[in-house]
Amino acid sequence: MDSLNSLKGRNLTMLVDFYEMTMANGYLKNGMGDTVAYFDMFFRKVPDGGGYVIMAGVEQLCEYLKGLKFTPEDIEYLRGRGFSEEFLDYLADFKFSCDVYAVPEGTPIFQAQFVETMVLLCINHQSLIATKANRIVRAAQGRPIMEFGSRRAQGFDAAIYGARAAYIGGCAGTACAVSDIMFGVPALGTMAHSWVQLFDTELEAFCAYAREYPDNCVLLVDTYNALKSGVPNAIEAFKRELLPRGYRPKGIRFDSGDIAYLSRKARKMLDEAGFEDCTIVASNSLDEYLIRDMIGQGAKVDSFGVGERLITSSSSPVLGGVYKLCAVEKDGKICPRIKISDNVAKISTPCFKKPWRLFDRETGKAIADLVTLNNEVIDDTKPYEIFDPDFTWKRKIVENYVAKPLTVQLFKDGECVYECPPLDEVKRYCAEQIDTLWDEVLRFDNPHNYYVDLSQKLWDEKQRLLAEHGKKGEQ
């Protein structure tokens, strides 16, 4: 079970891209080992062509950073790869000493060298799954979504932490029991087709299950013929085993077929038998689009189990978060750095920065995000002009708004100063934050482009660096 423990019990210090080590060794050899540098982690493209991404993975990132330590075995491995003794001595005595700021988990977002890999790994994966889960939850229009994807996840960590992220995104629970043990994500589940197949008859299987679990009896009715045998046998089992003992059935589940059609027929059969309170659960390779269509077609489904298309975010399986240097300190002064590309979208934004979210004071809805220099303060008692950083003639004066900083400090001088909230609190916070977004941002198809703007001072600094490097390129 150690391998399935939380990050608190695992030393993942060497889970790095190898070039992080070669660069760190080079910095030390070139007298740059004590240089203070600033890095940004951000993304450029929203999965599934959506309008937002949900921040997740912060707790695991904190656990990783608190546990950074190179073991003697790590040192010997690196010695065998030809790293200098000076660098190995540095790693043997290594202590994490950075300041880290992050957007809290559950926040919708729009758009230290060797920690790069794990920073991206923790945040990219869980943010991707939390976002996909939230899309699916919203498609269900209040009907509970259960995460059923463990067996289809890409590795056991993806199953475990994917279930955690799905819960943040709004899922009611998971089939992954270890995620309940580790994080308190409610474990849910009933039976598989193998239960029915193991008995001589479907009715016998249903009756045995009802006797064993009378207070949580959900029967899988599509092993043989859903409408001709499955639903009728479920009704008979309910009458034989539950009603005489004072119990009511919890539900039936379909895992195949035309579920919109089957659920309508089954609902009628259950109601006629006096089981109006018996719920209908649907699974079978579902996603937000299929769920939306099923509901639009009048499906009588009360909850959904969603597996592979959630836990892998199969329609958009990668969140392309990146990690870029944005400034270094020289002689006590923060000097901005920029990364330039022929692809305009890949030009980084320099400087030590602070992100803000502007909310309409009357509606509570988010107006735009604003990225400023770290020492800038937004006075929300005064009108503020925001503008598109690419199409600068697009400008808007914002009034009657509230400006809130988006980030919290996680680490100060290498010490964790942030207390990660309980997962249920993160889930509630996520739902509250999603409610601050306009429907136009939340729609699945061609969502409104939520504005992420730069302050005038930050935009000016970016243009200055672009011009400066442009002149260097001409020489």
Residue ranges and their predicted role:
Residues 61-68, 77, 81, 90, ...:
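Residues that form generic nucleotide/phosphate-binding pockets
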Residues 193, 283, 307:
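Residue-level "edge-of-site" marker
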Residues 2-38, 44-47, 82, 88-97, ...:
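Buried, small/hydrophobic-residue-enriched core segments of structured protein domains
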Residues 63-65, 102-104, 109:
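An N-terminal, globular interaction/scaffold subdomain
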Residues 2-35, 39, 44, 48-53, ...:
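Gly/Ser/Thr/Ala-enriched C-terminal appendages of enzymes
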Residues 38-79:
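Low-complexity, highly charged intrinsically disordered N-terminal segments
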